[in-house]
From Swiss-Prot:
Natural source organism: Nicotiana tabacum
Miscellaneous: On the 2D-gel the determined pI of this unknown protein is: 4.8, its MW is: 15.4 kDa.
Record lineage: Eukaryota, Viridiplantae, Streptophyta, Embryophyta, Tracheophyta
Protein name in the entry: Unknown protein from 2D-PAGE
Amino acid sequence: LLSTLTDTSIKEAVATDKAP
């Protein structure tokens, strides 16, 4: 669960970083 939650958080952070 923790691993999945962290992975999702990382993906969201990357998406936000790539957003204009």
